[in-house]
């Protein structure tokens, strides 16, 4: 149940999961909100890190084309851009970039050899934010095993314990 203005209503959704024995990078869950008016409420979407949405998910695989084939089985409502070092899949809501290990390390070269890549994995999550103010306060004192890179357009965190890069871009 969701309570809005003192009135309880039932939020409804459907989920589909793809287990990690099929998609080697990890588990994937899709959630279709059947009552979006009870979920996507502006006052519930704000956070002190000012993140408004997920811009991109990167997946690392020794064969990015095989991942593309799996995505094509899930939906045909996508735009595909194949380049030499990355395959980009765009939906109405998100961008998924498929890399091999070498190309991913090149994109995130600021972290050098600190990136510990597996053959198949989720590599990074790019989030849109309206301000870097809160993010600039985060440092290695706050989080164990964290590396940070910043320029005028983005702030990147390598969370070594989770083997994941969080990238924040300003909108």
Where are these predicted regions, by residue range?
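Glyoxalase I/VOC metalloenzyme domain signal
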Residues: 1-171
